[in-house]
Amino acid sequence: MPNPIYLAELNEADYPRVREKDPTLPETHRAWLRGADERVQILRGRGKNPVRYPIRFRAFAERNDVLGIPSFDQAARDDYADEQGRAHTAAL
């Protein structure tokens, strides 16, 4: 199973390192990264730490109109990210 990808990791500077963790992720898509950055700013504006938010790939793709990215079609990745996020939050 792939490692969870957290929202704060989705920026142009960190994305190559993120793809090393999960090579099934698509190459950089600027609209996707821009959407991730907007979400990070919203969370920070609410006083939240975006490092604690794993991506639910399908929902994120739908909100950002990037459904053409094949790797976002995997429900198992959504479920895994949710499980990892809950485990991470519970450990805090």
Predicted region positions:
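N-terminal low-complexity, charged segments
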Residues: M1-L92
